[in-house]
């Protein structure tokens, strides 16, 4: 993401078959590890878990999220968390947008045609981070370090 505009690099979904929970969590961990190894991000933004009407679903979502966070933490990546409302506010301008509105705005902001709702949600979370004070401050620090490196290489 540049200072003025977000740019699309890649997106996708880690799909896990109807395996035992431990195998699904392992697949998520390994999938996120592969993405980190391939793209070398310098930070990660994730959506906070919300309490759903189904407690079992919320617990499983929390476990899957934990597997993804540990995969990133193993690479010493800073992890930023945002609520669904914060993400919707940053992308659509109001905190109660629906999935179609999020998907439409992500496609417009990044000039992509992301038809997978889960991938669009992940991209929305990344764009949200870029639009927040933490995201802007982290980018400024990173650009400052890169500038110092470039000057020292001269």
Predicted regions and their residues:
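Phosphate- and other anionic-substrate recognition elements at nucleic-acid/protein interfaces
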Residues: 1-154
């Amino acid at each position: 993401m540049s200072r003025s505009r977000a740019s699309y690099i890649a997106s996708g979904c880690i799909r896990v078959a109807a395996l035992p929970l431990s195998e699904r969590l392992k697949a998520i961990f390994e999938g996120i590890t592969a993405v980190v190894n391939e793209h070398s991000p310098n930070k990660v933004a994730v959506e906070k878990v919300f309490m759903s009407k189904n407690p079992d679903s919320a617990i499983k979502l929390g476990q899957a999220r934990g597997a993804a966070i540990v995969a990133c933490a193993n690479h010493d990546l800073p992890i930023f968390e945002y609520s669904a409302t914060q993400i919707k506010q940053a992308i659509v301008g109001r905190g109660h947008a629906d999935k179609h509105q999020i998907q439409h705005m992500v496609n417009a902001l990044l000039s992509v045609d992301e038809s997978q709702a889960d991938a669009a949600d992940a991209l929305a979370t990344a764009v949200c981070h870029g639009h927040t004070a933490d995201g802007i401050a982290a980018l400024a620090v990173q650009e400052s370090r890169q500038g110092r490196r470039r000057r020292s290489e001269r």
